[in-house]
């Protein structure tokens, strides 16, 4: 079939949690006619990224040719190691063609995981909850605050948020500052998010 066919031809992009960066994306016209007045729009439903200039006018792309577009972005410090930013690149031209590409991004950052916990967790109990957390990411974690959140009327939290000043990659930290209450309405064996 004759016509233009524009798609992203660059590979996986790299980003660091908590930093500004430019995503350089190469577009290639795989078709056999000129793609006229090409527009490229980068989008994401993620709350962990801010797109500063999401729509870029590319102009014309000849058959077999490349054009590079640069999207300035900020990846928030809340983005963790290998976070899926769910980026999508929508390319359109003057002829009404539209092409949609998934944009893969490797995010470098901390990744805080619960390694272990201790405390009496049963319906109707109030307990001092102890957490062992490990940074399993690719970057140190610094100046974070950790807060356990209540769940419906089933889990109550009686403690203030805890601050973490620094946690290097592979390091653990024990936190024993959490007072938690569990409703007597909880059924044994229930799984509750926290």
Language-model features, listed with the residues they occupy:
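Enriched for extracellular/lumenal, surface-exposed ectodomains of secreted and cell-surface proteins
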Residues: 43-44, 57-59, 73, 86-97, ...
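Hydrophobic core residues within well-ordered beta-strands of beta-rich domains
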Residues: 21, 67, 85, 127-129, ...
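Terminal connector regions
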Residues: 1, 74-111, 181-194
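Short, solvent-exposed loop/linker segments at beta-strand-coil boundaries, enriched for Pro/Gly
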Residues: 44-50, 109-111, 150-156
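Asparagine-centered strand-capping/turn motif at beta-strand->loop junctions
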Residues: 27-31, 132-137
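Short acidic/proline- and small/hydrophobic-mixed sequence motifs that coincide with surface turns
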Residues: 20, 32-38, 99, 126, ...
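Intrinsically disordered, low-complexity Pro/Gly/Ser/Thr-rich segments with frequent PxxP/GP/PP motifs
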Residues: 50-79, 156-186
């Amino acid at each position: 079939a004759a016509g233009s066919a524009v798609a992203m031809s660059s590979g996986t992009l790299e980003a660091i949690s908590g930093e500004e960066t430019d995503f350089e994306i190469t577009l290639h016209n795989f078709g056999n006619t000129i793609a006229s007045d090409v527009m490229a729009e980068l989008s994401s439903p993620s709350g962990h990224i801010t797109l500063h200039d999401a729509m870029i006018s590319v102009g014309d792309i000849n058959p077999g040719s490349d054009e590079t577009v640069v999207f300035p972005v900020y990846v928030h410090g809340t983005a963790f190691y290998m976070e899926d930013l769910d980026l999508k690149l929508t390319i359109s031209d003057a002829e009404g063609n539209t092409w949609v590409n998934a944009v893969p991004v490797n995010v470098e950052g901390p990744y805080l995981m619960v390694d272990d916990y201790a405390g009496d967790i049963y319906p109707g109990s109030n307990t001092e909850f102890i957490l062992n957390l490990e940074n399993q990411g690719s970057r140190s974690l610094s100046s974070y605050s950790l807060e356990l959140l209540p769940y419906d009327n089933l889990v109550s939290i009686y403690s203030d948020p805890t601050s973490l000043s620094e946690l290097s990659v592979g390091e653990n930290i024990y936190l024993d500052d959490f007072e938690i209450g569990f409703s007597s309405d909880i059924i044994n064996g229930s799984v509750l998010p926290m």
